[in-house]
């Protein structure tokens, strides 16, 4: 497949917490869509190894959520470093989207960007500086058209790949019901 500068890169990560200065990435997924939000390619979901000291430092919410999903066990079994995960994701993206073209797409994407800037700076730099943050549309819909905001229910699995597809479907919902496109 040839690179397409209209393609969009969607990202979601699961982390050990919300502080990008002290918490760590434990799962990362990427999906490339075309401009009409059709899936072009899906990267393998990567689970990143973290030491027990990092996992034991998670708050109750993260321990419960990532424990129930099985992610903690996957992290313990993983041998993949952040650097290796970053290299694999960059290799995945290269055939589909030129560097510095696609905005970073997802929900509350600024948080992902903050973690990438510290933990995977080359991957963060692959994105354009702009963001396509679906949560912005959610906040506007809540205020301007509450019925549109209430008309979409996310699965909320807190699994990176499932959350990306939730975000894509949510953007399709707003495209149809907020923008009438």
Curated annotation (Swiss-Prot):
Q: Where are the transmembrane segments?
A: none
Q: Which Gene3D superfamilies match?
A: Ribonuclease H-like superfamily/Ribonuclease H (3.30.420.10)
Recorded GO MF terms: 3'-5'-RNA exonuclease activity; nucleic acid binding
Which superkingdom, per the lineage?
Bacteria
Question: So what EC number does this one have?
Answer: 3.1.15.-
Predominant place of localization: cytoplasm
Q: Which residues form the active site?
A: 129
A Pfam family of this chain = RNase_T
Record keyword Lipid metabolism present: no
Task: Identify one Gene Ontology CC term for this UniProt entry.
Answer: cytoplasm
This protein's UniProt keywords: Cytoplasm, Exonuclease, Hydrolase, Nuclease
The yes or no answer to whether the keyword Hydrolase is present is: yes
Q: GO biological process annotations for this chain's record?
A: DNA metabolic process
InterPro entries (alphabetical): Exonuclease_RNaseT/DNA_pol3 (IPR013520), Oligoribonuclease (IPR022894), RNaseH-like_sf (IPR012337), RNaseH_sf (IPR036397)
Q: Where in the cell is it found?
A: Cytoplasm
- What does the similarity note say? Belongs to the oligoribonuclease family.
Q: What does this protein do?
A: 3'-to-5' exoribonuclease specific for small oligoribonucleotides.
Q: What is this protein called?
A: Oligoribonuclease
